[in-house]
Amino acid sequence: MKNKLVIALGATIMLVSACHKTEDPAPVTTDFNTMKEQVLIDFTNKVAVPGYKDLADASDNLYSTLQTLNDNPTEDNLAAARTSWKNMRTIWEQCEGFLFGPVEDNDYDPNMDTWPTDYVQMDSLLNSSNNLEVSDIQAATLSLRGYHPIEYIIFGNHGDRKAADITTRQKKYMISLATDLKGTCHDLYQSWTADPVNFAKQVITAGNGSAKYAKKQEAYLAIVESMIDICDEVGGGKMKEPFDTRDPQMVESPYSGNSLADFKNNLVGLRNVYIGKYKEDGLGINDLVSSKNVALDNKLQTQMTAAINSFDNITVFYEDAIINQRVQSQNTMNALNELKQTLEGELKPFIIQYITD
């Protein structure tokens, strides 16, 4: 990210641009007390805020490509819109590695990413007399809002939608959805970077005047709990629910065939949080862990890599895999469960033991 992100935190805290950080990296420290402050700073400035900035920018780009498709419904413009949608999903799914704070408190997550969707319900809305204005979308059932109705309109079933077949009503719905989604993403970014919430400041000053976290430990536990939650959501929800029911309609992102990429990026986002890296390196929780317990750090990183790589063994759409590649699917869920158990049973107690202030 090239533009500067500046968060006012008084005379003691100053952010510099990513470019400057690359040219003049901060000196590495092995002092635990210093590291536990720097890890919160780097998580905020190098993972969370840049991720949400990229998400807001991606929402602008998606809106632009959908507007172009609306004005000129060619196959090339449809392909560009699909690419923009998938690119935005990559960013968002990685941001789901830290679903705490405003994204949860203000319902930004369900407002833009509720699943499963019901194409019958969407078709019913499209065939109704609803005006499909942005305000109508915001008042609708959550499953009729956000990424997945856009996905349904531009992909159809696994990409069989033709640009010329997108109806006037679908275009109206699509643009209102994109407008609403764009607003949500910008609100989410602003909630981290601007008053009155300025959640970045609340994380960085945890235990030192934060209005949200009286102790650093509270901020760390919120971060670790979000890692546990996304691990459980993917393995115990996104994958397991359609797997157990053998119901393809329960799968997230089914119209685009993007489900496995979504799941994998959730775990990439979890690892980003742990190692303090998104586009550039920072100090991460791994540095704290390895300074006290090298074996635990090795175990966590090995399990994260194994879980991420396991998705590559599923070689068909996940809605097909729940029928035809059940062993591979179960192996991935097992890997996710093992990681979750280590996060919950070993990393969380580590935080409680070593970060007490």
Show where each model-derived region lies.
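Mature extracytoplasmic or organellar-lumen-exposed domains after removal of signal/transit peptides
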Residues: 26-357
